[in-house]
Amino acid sequence: MNRIRTLTFDLDDTLWDNREVIMAAEQALHDWLGEHYPRVTDRYSLEDMRRMRTDLVGQEPDLRNRITDLRKQSLRLAARTVGYDEELVDPAFAIFIAARHRVSLYDDVTPALHRLRKAGYRLGSLTNGNADVYRLGIAHLFDFSLTAESVGRAKPHPRLFEEACRLSGVSPAELAHVGDEADTDLAGGLAAGVNVIWMNRLEQPATPGITPHAEVRDMAGLLAMLGIEAQQSRN
């Protein structure tokens, strides 16, 4: 991977632990609905709402590419089912998305991104989710940021990777994507012909049939793999 000029990063579970974030955001939404629209929570548990979203994707697969629309559609359906007006959808989603942005970056993220930029790499973020790097206050760490919603296709579709190459003016061989999900980040990057680096913070077992170009446990491992420390020590 000596030709790498651009590095792209997944967001959720690569730059922060997203599991607790989403659980807390869904709980905040459920609590708000219970206070303001109690018939919704009387009828639907958190798990019921998750199943509803799964069912909606089954009926309309393109919702995988529009995660915000998916959540709003589930709220709309829940409201109609229990006899509320759909006006609850926007304020309810606002509660969720505010909590969804209460993330804590892994300690190694910001220093590593600064070092990568200093080393001359162009940096981008590629996410299937609806986290907004501007709202998170980390947009300055990236040269560009792309979402599945902005390009119309979610990973593993190659479009996000292709658009990243276009924006940074590099060939697929000159771009490396760093992500945690085998089925989306790794499989999608491989299909697009870019280099893929598995950020395996939790030391998960490999997925059969999906072989990344490299595997690291944290950002220090990524820096070491790219030789950033050695470069800086000689300067």
Question: Which residues make up each language-model segment?
Answer:
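Asp-based, Mg2+/Mn2+-dependent phosphohydrolase catalytic module
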Residues: 1-7, 19-20, 84-89, 110, ...
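N-terminal helical cap/lid subdomain that shapes the substrate entry/recognition surface
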Residues: 2-107
